[in-house]
Structures are given as structure tokens and as C-alpha cells.
């Protein structure tokens, strides 16, 4: 079932095929997909939305896991198989980034996805190619008057003081 050469329609793929540069963002739902589309670099960043919580593969059989639409889509998009047949060299992306909401459900979904990767795509984890995004991450575009190119900055809140009154926003280190 997973040998199909066509990728899931919900995948928003990147243009590059250079595995060293490509990144697959697994995002929680179609609403997150819309926001992620606006902030991604389509040259090397692909997006795959998943619907809700995936199957808990720790408790499920291999047959159930492969029959789950979300698990099957993730395995198919990564393109390296699963279990004993997983081939790291066949992976289509250099990095797989889990991007879930900053709530309890998001943490649960992240845990379920990490379990899927650890149980069925462990070489990807062992190679250090699975990441979890830490929300909130904001994309700012600074308009440069008189120039065609605007500066793009990704930021998050970095608290430098325990007092809310003295907290400052800071750029992420480059």
C-alpha cells in the first residue's frame, strides 16, 4: 500500500531535491498549514498537515499502524520505508520537524509522532534528523525602503529577567 509513487495530495512539497537542505514540517491541522505556508521557504521547506492525534503506535500492531491514514502518509512522504526495511539513504528530507500547538493536545501529538519515529524510523532519530519546533516562533519582515529585498527575521520570546516588568524580547541567535 505504501509503495505508491504518488505522494499524498495534502503534502505541500518543496522545490529542492537536495536532501542536505530539505526540511519536512509536520504541522497540526489545516489551519496551521495556512500559517506555515506563509512563513516557509518553498525552495527547501515542505509541509505535511496531519489531522488530530495519530494512532498510538506503542499499543498498535504493525498492520494497524500501516492502516492508519496519518501514519501511512508520514511514512510515504519521508520515502524511506518503515521498520526493518527503513533505509536512511532513501529519505527525501534532511530534517523532519514536528510543529504542534503549544497546548496539552499539541504535546500529546508530538509524543505520538516521536513514538512513531522511534519505533518505525529509528535510524532517522539516531541520525539526529528529527526535531520538535518550540512555539511560539514569529516571522517578521522588515521593509527596506528603496530596496526590493526585505529582511526576514525569525524571533521568539527570550526572557532575560524573572520579573515580567523587566522582560525583553530578543532575536533568536543566528
Feature-to-residue mapping (PLM):
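Conserved small/polar residues in nucleotide/adenosyl-binding loops
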Residues: 159-168
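Intrinsically disordered, low-complexity regulatory segments
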Residues: 36-94, 125, 152-153
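GHKL-family ATPase ATP-binding module
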Residues: 1-53, 86-88, 94-95
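Conserved phosphate-handling catalytic cores of large alpha/beta enzymes
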Residues: 136-155
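Alpha-helical scaffold elements adjacent to nucleotide-binding pockets in ATP/GTP-utilizing enzyme cores
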Residues: 70-73, 108-116
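Hydrophobic alpha-helical segments, chiefly the membrane-spanning helices
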Residues: 171-173
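Interdomain boundary/hinge elements
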Residues: 122-141
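N-terminal assembly/transducer modules of large multi-domain enzymes
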Residues: 99-108
